[in-house]
UniProtKB/Swiss-Prot annotation:
A biological process from GO: organelle transport along microtubule
Region (Interaction with ZNF289/ARFGAP2): 609-874
Keyword annotations: Cytoplasm, Cytoplasmic vesicle, ER-Golgi transport, Golgi apparatus, Membrane, Phosphoprotein, Protein transport, Repeat, Transport
Protein name as annotated: Coatomer subunit gamma-1
Main subcellular localisation: cytoplasm
KW Protein transport (keyword) present: yes
Subcellular location, record wording: Cytoplasm, Cytosol; Golgi apparatus membrane; Cytoplasmic vesicle, COPI-coated vesicle membrane
Biased composition (Basic and acidic residues): 1-11
One cellular component (GO) term of this entry: COPI vesicle coat
Record-listed Phosphothreonine modification sites: T594
MF annotations from Gene Ontology: structural molecule activity
Gene: Copg1
Length: 874
């Protein structure tokens, strides 16, 4: 008997779990009771509960002791006590992976599975399938087929769900049960129909045509189960995505028809599916939004929450589509459920007008302290979107954010606010000084190291450009005096950036850095000593290279190259150009983690996509002498349609003097295998094809890779743009789709692919230059050239900027890819590295009259990159 605990025990937490202090050895000793006769069902069930508790708490049972306990437990099948029998089933499932020879209970389970006691049959099916492997499955196949079509819903559902689990290890056997599953799918029981539909889909999911037929059949005859409808909607939406989402498809019509279903869960599932379809227009969203609007006034909190959460998601891409719901959303602002109220307000922030912002901010302020950090982050994200939409409201929004920043909150919440403030500072120069001042106040009492170092990095980047940079020095130096070593190191870096950009402040900065040289921490001392020595040289090029812009190489690549250098001693100094560059995504204009990463690196930095390619190419003998990989194209280029018999995608790899084309090939014909697959290429310009590395075999639906090696132009090095015609050549061998047997004889064949373009962007790696002016001075004007062009087909500055960035493949610096409103002039600043490791910078001045006139000035450490830029633009 378990003792009864009083309320005091419950509140203190003492004794709330009677199984809390179990010992494995004691429990296994108790399990010997299973061998006693007569069987005591209540006592044995309690011991089984203890064993299950130990297993689920992660207690390790040795194979021998688990097997002994399991064999003892099998004797409990002699008892007809229903509770004890159900506990036996649970124990069999849990111990099937630990104990040996668990198949000893097969006959007992089969007997229960085919017996007259319905309460035993379903659990017996589940337990039997848990201990059955692929070799034994055929022995119980007949029983499984009978169970699937059983008239008792619990038995049928158990068999269907167990079949779904068995698919992973015995697909071919379970596939033979499709007829029984089809019969079960017409059941009147909602769970049986749902489980049968799930099994049918998973058997056929790799055959798109079979899935389409299944959807067509069940949508035509209708379904009784709302769960089955929900699953069918998900299958149909997945199929729509794979078919590039044609809205004329009967699949879309089916999903839309489900908006009129009598079950609320089906209606919501259909609305959610339409909302999440890629490329959905506002017109196609309208019926889904109307349904969600009705749910907003539902008496059920779950429906109101689901509706407003989904509308919030729609408002991110299609705010105009949600505008019709604004009145309903305003009613939800006062909802008693704070989660619903928060989502309603953030949705209104995305869809509301500029005039409603002040009122909404007051409403948010009234309950911000009552909601969780998770929803506070949602509010901050909505405010961030609002800042971009209504720049004139920056002042109101900034004040609200600063108030939130001063309140209590967790890391994610504070980080979201800091992100938002930084984006406002970068978007709106008028709010820069106000924003920096508030961030300075925040780091005076900031408990989060990551945020403190990030703000210090921002101060070092933006502070020197303000009207009165000296006012930030006190806040930064306070961090050196008061904080721990990571923040102190970030503060030292920020101080150095002020000294590198402001000659008047340099003497004061040098004094502060000299004090930091005596710091207790190695990192802080090393930084201070390094920056002190660089600044004392008073050379702009050194300041730019070692303080303001820093390294642009990949950290894992640098680590690997240094390790290789130490393993193979050489008299030559280490060449930094042999290290792959850090690829910077176009969307990431802010160097958010630079300061933090410099202070404390994570234990293991994940290899980038380019580093993975580097390893793969280094393993090919033909590419051994090519040197380090400079760049891989960001996205593979499709050279065939996705529905054709062969799917070919090409990735371009650039080396200092060569290009390697990697062709990822998939054979979608199940009655043939391709061998010795190569892609023959013919260039239109001065490129020279050197060799081909074939894919030895390309069986049905198994990807393979072949390569083509090409030498870059030598006679005219500026002729880097080129078009290659491509033909795939291979040997075809027929094979039996059922057995996979391949014919010995084959025949030669070829397949014409789309042409492949090589552009100037394939020869340039984009890099971030935080301080473009310093980088410009660092490169110098020795190899500077300038030309003026007219872009006759372009009518706006935004279009011109977008085209130039895409064409040159360089990184826009200092947010110069954002064109201010109502301006007819703009300067675009671009940075990159040309193959071979040569910095290349471009300053493009744009003037809009009737057409766009562009003055391009290019600088590099070598003449060739400058010539290539101007030749390609011309």
């Amino acid at each position: 008997m378990l003792k009864k605990f009083d309320k005091k025990d419950e509140e203190s937490g003492g004794g709330s779990n009677p199984l809390q202090h179990l010992e494995k050895s004691a429990v296994l000793q108790e399990a010997r009771v299973f061998n006693e006769t007569p069987i005591n069902p209540r006592k044995c069930a309690h011991i089984l509960t203890k064993i299950l508790y130990l297993i689920n708490q992660g207690e390790h049972l040795g194979t021998t002791e688990a097997t002994e306990a399991f064999f003892a437990m099998t004797k409990l099948f002699q008892s007809n006590d229903p509770t004890l029998r159900r506990m036996c089933y649970l124990t069999i499932k849990e111990m099937s992976c630990i104990a040996e020879d668990v198949i000893i209970v097969t006959s007992s389970l089969t007997k229960d599975m085919t017996g007259k006691e319905d309460n035993y049959r379903g659990p017996a099916v589940r337990a039997l399938c848990q201990i059955t492997d692929s070799t034994m499955l055929q022995a119980v196949e007949r029983y499984m087929k009978q169970a699937i079509v059983d008239k008792v819903p619990s038995v049928s559902s158990s068999a269907l769900v167990s079949s779904l689990h068995l698919l992973k290890c015995s697909f071919d056997v379970v596939k033979r049960w499709v007829n029984e599953a089809q019969e079960a799918a017409s059941s009147d029981n909602i769970m049986v129909q749902y489980h049968a539909l799930g099994l049918l889909y998973h058997v056929r999911k790799n055959d798109r045509l079979a899935v389409s037929k299944m959807i067509s059949k069940f949508t035509r005859h209708g379904l009784k189960s709302p769960f089955a409808y929900c699953m069918m909607i998900r299958v149909a939406s997945k199929q729509l995505e794979e078919e590039d989402g044609s809205r004329d498809s009967p699949l879309f019509d089916f999903i839309e028809s489900c908006l009129r279903n009598k079950h609320e869960m089906v209606v919501y599932e259909a609305a959610s599916a339409i909302v999440n379809l890629p490329g959905c227009s506002a017109k196609e969203l309208a019926p889904a939004v109307s349904v969600l609007q009705l749910f907003c006034s539902s008496p059920k909190a779950a429906l109101r929450y689901a509706a407003v959460r989904t509308l919030n998601k729609v408002a991110m891409k299609h705010p105009s589509a949600v505008t019709a719901c604004n009145l309903d959303l305003e009613n939800l602002v006062t909802d008693s459920n704070r989660s619903i109220a928060t989502l309603a307000i953030t949705t209104l922030l995305k869809t509301g007008s500029e005039s409603s912002i002040d009122r909404l901010m007051k409403q948010i302020s009234s309950f911000m302290s009552e909601i969780s950090d998770e929803f506070k982050v949602v509010v901050v994200q909505a405010i961030s979107a609002l800042c971009q939409k209504y720049p004139r409201k920056h002042a109101v929004l900034m004040n609200f954010l600063f108030t939130m920043l001063r309140e209590e909150g967790g890391f994610e919440y504070k980080r979201a606010i800091v992100d938002c403030i930084i984006s406002i500072i970068e978007e709106n120069s008028e709010s820069k000084e106000t924003g920096l001042s508030h961030l300075c106040e925040f780091i005076e009492d900031c408990e989060f190291t990551v945020l403190a170092t990030r703000i210090l990095h921002l101060l070092g980047q933006e502070g020197p450009k303000t009207n009165n940079p000296s006012k930030y020095i006190r806040f930064i130096y306070n961090r050196v005096v008061l904080e721990h070593e990571e923040v102190r190191a970030g503060a030292v870096s920020a101080l150095a950036k002020f000294g590198a950009q402001n000659e008047e402040m340099l003497p004061s900065i040098l004094v502060l850095l000299k004090r930091c040289v005596m710091d207790d921490d190695n990192e802080v001392r090393d930084r201070a000593t390094f920056y002190l020595n660089v600044l004392e040289q008073k050379q702009k090029a050194l300041n730019a290279g070692y303080i303001l812009n820093g390294l642009t190489v990949s950290i894992p690549g640098l680590e690997k190259a240094l390790q290789q250098y130490t393993l193979e001693p050489s008299e030559k100094p280490f060449d930094l150009k042999s290290v792959p560059l850090a690829t910077t995504p176009m969307a990431e204009q802010r160097p958010e983690s630079t300061a933090t990463a410099a202070v404390k690196q994570p234990e293991k930095v994940a290899a980038t996509r380019q580093e993975i390619f580097q390893e793969q190419l280094a393993a090919v003998p033909e590419f051994q002498g090519l040197g380090p990989l400079f760049k891989s194209s960001p996205e593979p280029v499709a050279l065939t349609e996705s529905e054709t018999e062969y799917v070919i995608r090409c990735t371009k790899h650039t080396f200092s003097d060569h290009l390697v084309f990697q062709f990822d090939c998939t054979n979608t014909l199940n009655d043939q295998t391709l061998e010795n697959v190569t892609v023959q290429m013919e260039p239109t310009e001065a490129y020279e094809v050197l060799s081909y590395v074939p894919a030895r075999s390309l069986p049905y639906n198994q990807p393979g890779t072949c390569y083509t090696l090409v030498a870059l132009p030598t006679e005219d090095p500026t002729a880097v743009a080129c078009t290659f015609s491509c033909v795939m050549k291979f040997t075809v061998k027929d094979c039996d789709p059922n057995t996979g047997e391949i014919d010995e004889e084959g025949y030669e064949d070829e397949y014409v692919l789309e042409d492949l373009e090589v552009t100037v962007a394939d020869h340039i790696q984009k890099v971030m230059k935080v301080n473009f002016e310093a980088a410009w001075d660092e490169v110098g004007d020795e190899f500077e050239k300038e030309e003026t062009f007219t872009l006759s087909t372009i009518k706006t500055l935004e279009e011109a900027v977008g085209n130039i960035v895409k064409f040159l493949g360089m990184h826009p610096c200092e947010r110069s890819d954002k064109v201010p409103e109502n301006k007819n002039t703009h300067t675009l600043l671009l940075a990159g590295v040309f193959r071979g490791g040569h910095d290349i910078l471009v300053r493009s001045r744009l003037l809009l009259l009737d057409t766009v006139t562009m003055q391009v000035t290019a600088r590099s450490s070598e003449e060739l990159p400058v010539d290539i830029i101007l030749a390609s633009v011309g």
